[in-house]
Regions:
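Catalytic cores of the polymerase beta-like nucleotidyltransferase superfamily
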Residues: 1-483
Length: 483
């Protein structure tokens, strides 16, 4: 973070786009301020291509005049029902910016809310009114764009001090802020996660108190914020805040339920919630994409329902991977996440995440690795990344043994992939030929015959060639009474 004087801020805003807005503001005799994330990111020294401008007057009028001056190189969108307008500038020639730029204009306003809706009642207001309605102090700072005050920082809630101290706090009483717009509770946690800030105590207490209000927010908006938390550098910060606040119990009760340690006869299982956060952080170290992170977050959600006590061996979670995979679609629907190949990918990784561990815990055989590659297909590398991340044992000897065996599994996988085994492992005799040969329609018998051939190829008991496979097929068909 870096602090700037008003004169230095004026130099940072010494760009054609801001001078154009300044000229328009003075021409229309209105006050204009750049606000919100753009101002915050100036002090955080982060790039930002989205500019929010508050106009004490008509934001639409300023946007229309700016578009007229920019000409064809800009695109204007007006949203009269909301009193806002957006100017998109695709070229840097008129703005001095390095790439595409979006400037959103809104008239200064005051807002009030009913208890069961996050749609505000809006009235015209002053800059102070507009700053009052902002979600957090670090987003409530404004910089004047009018010529006579160009670069002047307006910071009534000490947002700059909170930014310097790494604090998330609200301009108004936080209970009012969160009740008015409960989505701000997720945004609060998201900013704390992205910026690695602390949530101020009074603000967090209000968040805990108001958590139930999140239920009036649409699934789509919740899902967007959850994905932003997930893509942070350290998403575990956000999920720990979600758990402590009570929001996780509402949004992802399957994950929240893992936050328990049960002990019996002196034997305790680990806290699978914090284990999950550790696994998530481990995949993030490998720059994991969004849905691999979701797979890491959900990989153990089946453990709560599969937990059993065995006097001989202690706590068990048999088939938690299988049950967890079945739980994924309901979670994706609840959070309005895509129910397409992305969801199936997460299901697949959750279901298969124990497979490499089982292989690594035993002798690493060619047959087991061939089966793993065949079943995982193109997702094998992500599966291995997840499984390696899942090794969080504090027993360094055991951890070293698993990781060494995983290295051997990866070597064998590399050899198989180089030989194009994904293609070679598919038997040369397919289901259509089997149905034609034995005059069958699609049925259980066809599946058994196909699986017989596939198992033989995967186990390397017969070469993937027509003559030996045909011999095996006829033997199996005769055993089943089909020939």
């Amino acid at each position: 973070m870096k602090l700037y004087s008003d004169e230095e801020l004026a130099e940072l805003l010494d760009q054609p786009i801001f001078h154009m807005i300044s000229d328009v503001a003075d021409h229309l005799d209105v006050e204009c301020y750049v606000v919100g994330g753009y101002v915050r990111d100036i002090f955080l020294e982060r790039p930002s291509d989205d500019i929010d401008v508050v106009v004490v007057g008509s934001g639409i009028a300023v946007a229309e005049e700016l578009k007229r001056r920019l000409g064809r190189k800009a695109h204007l969108s007006v949203f009269r029902n909301f009193g806002t307008a957006q100017v998109k500038v695709a070229s840097s020639q008129r703005t001095g910016q390095a790439g595409p730029l979006e400037v959103e204009f809104v008239g200064a306003r005051r807002e009030s809310y009913s208890h069961d809706s996050r749609k505000p009642i809006v009235e015209d207001g002053t800059l102070e009114d507009d700053q009052n309605r902002r979600d957090f102090t670090i987003n409530a700072m404004a910089i004047c764009l009018n010529h006579d005050r160009f670069g002047e920082l307006v910071d009534p809630f000490n947002g700059l001090a909170d930014l310097e101290d790494g604090i998330i706090a609200t301009p108004l009483e936080p209970g009012v802020t969160f009740s008015d717009d409960p989505l701000r509770m997720l945004r609060c946690i998201r900013f704390a996660t992205q910026l690695n800030f602390q949530i101020e105590d009074v603000t967090f207490e209000a968040l805990q108190r108001m958590a139930d209000r999140i239920k009036i927010i649409s699934a789509e908006r919740v899902g967007v914020e959850m994905n932003k938390i997930m893509m942070a550098r350290h998403p575990s910060i956000g999920f720990e805040y979600l758990q402590r606040s009570g929001l996780l119990q509402i949004l992802l009760p399957e994950l929240s339920a893992l936050d328990i340690v049960e002990k019996k006869n002196g034997r305790a299982h680990k806290n699978n919630f914090y284990h999950t956060l550790e696994v998530l952080e481990n995949v993030v170290k490998n720059d994991a994409p969004l849905y691999l992170r979701w797979a890491a977050l959900l990989h153990d959600i089946g453990k709560t329902k599969t937990k059993r006590w065995d006097p001989a061996i202690g706590w068990t979670f048999h088939n938690h991977n299988y049950l967890g995979a079945k739980m994924v679609p309901a979670i994706f629907r609840r959070l309005a996440l895509p129910l397409d190949a992305k969801m199936k990918y997460v299901q697949k990784l959750v279901d298969m995440h124990m497979r490499p561990i089982v292989i690594a815990d035993e002798e690493v055989t060619d047959s087991a690795v061939r089966r793993l590659l065949n079943d995982a297909g193109e997702d094998i590398d992500d599966l291995m990344t997840l499984c390696e991340a899942d090794i969080t044992s504090k027993n360094e000897v055991r951890k070293k043994m698993f990781l060494e065996n995983f290295r051997m599994v990866r070597e064998k996988l590399t050899d198989l992939k180089e030989k194009d085994y994904v293609r070679l492992l598919q038997p040369v005799i397919d289901g259509n030929e089997i149905m034609e040969m034995f005059h069958l329609s699609p049925c259980r018998e066809v599946g058994i015959l196909k699986q017989t051939l596939k198992d033989a190829v995967l186990d390397n008991r017969v070469p993937n060639e027509r003559e030996p496979l045909m011999k095996l097929l006829m033997e199996k068909a005769q055993e089943m009474g089909l020939s």
